C-alpha cells in the first residue's frame, strides 16, 4: 500500500508536465557528460532572479551546496539559531568548524537578542533560515537587515537559507534578499528547486552571492559534475513553468491556512504557516506520528530538532482530500479525549 507522506515538504501537484517532457527529451543525451559549469542552467537562473550567472553556484540539492560552502570557506566558529535543519551543523562540523547554538526564544522566532549574541561573540559564520524549517517562522525584514549589516561590520559570512521563501511571497513579514544581494556581498542565499517543483528525487539546489570570488570558490570545491544532465534539463524547464508556479503558490497559500484552522480546532497549539507545511504542538498526544501509522500516514515528529521535544510536529500541505483524510484520522485518534482536552483549555 502507498503511504500518504506528510513528512516531506514537496509540492502535492507533483512534477510539472513541461519538466517531465524536458527530462524525457534529455534521456537521449545521457551518453554525454553534463556541463560541469552548468552554463545554461545558471543563465536561466540569472534571468529568473535578475542576477548575473557568475553570482550563482549550482549543486546536487541544497544540502550539497551547504556542505560545499562549509568546505570552501572553512569558517572557524559558526552561530546557529535552533531549532534548525540538521545539515547546517553536519556540514560545518565536517569542515572542522565549531558551532554554537542560539536557542530561539519561544515561540521559536529570531529576536533582536540575536544581534547582541552576534555583537559579543567571536563568530565568522552565521546561518539564518527564512522562513525557518520546521517552525515556519519568518525573520522580520527590519531585523534581518540589521543582522546582515552587523554581520558585515563583524566580518561574519552569512548563509541565508531561502529554500521556502518562494512559498511565503504573499506573507508581508517574509522578504527575499536576492534583489538586494549587491549591498551584502558577505551573504549567500541558498535556494532549491526540489520543493516547489517536486524534484526531490532529482536533487537540484543553488546559491546566489554577489561576491563572485565566493561562488567561484564554492564551484571548485567538491566533485565536478555536481549537477547531472537530467537535473539541469529539469531545472531550466521548471523556471519557465510560470502557470504551474502561480497555481501552486495560490493553492498552498489557501490550503495551509485551512489546515491551520482545522488543526487548531482539534486543540493543537498552532504556528502561523508561511510555506508548504504547518508546524504544531500536540501536548495531549506525544506519539501522534506512531498512532497515524496504522492509517497509512507519515507525519514528521520534531524531537530530532534541537530545542524541540516529541510533542512538536510538522505536516506538509498536501491535496485537499489528503489533508481532509489526515484531519479525519486525527479526529479518530483524539476521539472523546480530544474533545475533552479542547473544552478544558
Regions flagged by a language model, labelled:
Residues 253, 263-295:
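Conserved PLP-binding catalytic core of the aspartate aminotransferase-like
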Residues 142, 294-295, 304-345:
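PLP-dependent enzyme catalytic core of the Aspartate aminotransferase-like
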Residues 14-16, 37, 186-271:
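PLP-dependent aminotransferase class I/II
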Residues 71-128:
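PLP-dependent aminotransferase-like
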Residues 1-32, 121-122, 345:
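N-terminal "arm"/small-domain region of PLP-dependent enzymes with the aminotransferase-like
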Residues 17, 284-291, 322-325:
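Short, conserved charged micro-motifs
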Residues 34, 46-68, 81:
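Short loop-beta-helix segment that forms the pyridoxal 5′-phosphate
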Residues 109-122, 134-158, 162-196:
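Active-site pre-lysine segment of PLP-dependent enzymes
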Amino acid at each position: 500500500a502507498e503511504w500518504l507522506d506528510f513528512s516531506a515538504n514537496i509540492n502535492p501537484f507533483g512534477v510539472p508536465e513541461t519538466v517531465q517532457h524536458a527530462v524525457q527529451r534529455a534521456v537521449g543525451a545521457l551518453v554525454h557528460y553534463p556541463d560541469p559549469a552548468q552554463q545554461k542552467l545558471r543563465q536561466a537562473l540569472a534571468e529568473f532572479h535578475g542576477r548575473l550567472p557568475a553570482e550563482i553556484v549550482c549543486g546536487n540539492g541544497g544540502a550539497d551546496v551547504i556542505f560545499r560552502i562549509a568546505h570552501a570557506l572553512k569558517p572557524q566558529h559558526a552561530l546557529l539559531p535552533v531549532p534548525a535543519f540538521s545539515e547546517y551543523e553536519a556540514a560545518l562540523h565536517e569542515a572542522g568548524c565549531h558551532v554554537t547554538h542560539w536557542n530561539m526564544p519561544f515561540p521559536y522566532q529570531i529576536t533582536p537578542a540575536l544581534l547582541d549574541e552576534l555583537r559579543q561573540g567571536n563568530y565568522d559564520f552565521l546561518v539564518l533560515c527564512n522562513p525557518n524549517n520546521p517552525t515556519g517562522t519568518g525573520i522580520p525584514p527590519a531585523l534581518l537587515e540589521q543582522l546582515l549589516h552587523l554581520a558585515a561590520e563583524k566580518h561574519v559570512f552569512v548563509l541565508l537559507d531561502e529554500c521556502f521563501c518562494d512559498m511565503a511571497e504573499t506573507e508581508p513579514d517574509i522578504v527575499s534578499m536576492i534583489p538586494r544581494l549587491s549591498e551584502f556581498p558577505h551573504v549567500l542565499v541558498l535556494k532549491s528547486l526540489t520543493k516547489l517543483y517536486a524534484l526531490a528525487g532529482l536533487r537540484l539546489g543553488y546559491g546566489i552571492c554577489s561576491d563572485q570570488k565566493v561562488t567561484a570558490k564554492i564551484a571548485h570545491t567538491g566533485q565536478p559534475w555536481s549537477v547531472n544532465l537530467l537535473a539541469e534539463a529539469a531545472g531550466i524547464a521548471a523556471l519557465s513553468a510560470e502557470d504551474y508556479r502561480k497555481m501552486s503558490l495560490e493553492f498552498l497559500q489557501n490550503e495551509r491556512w485551512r489546515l491551520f484552522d482545522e488543526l487548531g480546532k482539534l486543540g493543537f497549539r498552532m504556528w502561523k504557516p508561511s510555506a508548504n507545511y504547518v508546524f504544531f504542538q500536540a501536548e495531549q498526544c506525544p506519539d501522534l506520528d506512531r498512532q497515524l501509522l496504522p492509517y497509512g500516514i507519515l507525519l514528521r515528529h520534531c524531537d530530532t530538532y534541537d530545542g524541540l521535544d516529541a510533542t512538536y510536529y510538522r505536516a506538509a500541505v498536501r491535496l485537499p482530500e489528503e489533508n481532509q483524510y489526515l484531519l479525519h484520522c486525527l479526529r479518530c485518534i483524539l476521539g472523546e479525549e480530544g474533545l475533552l482536552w479542547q473544552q478544558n483549555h
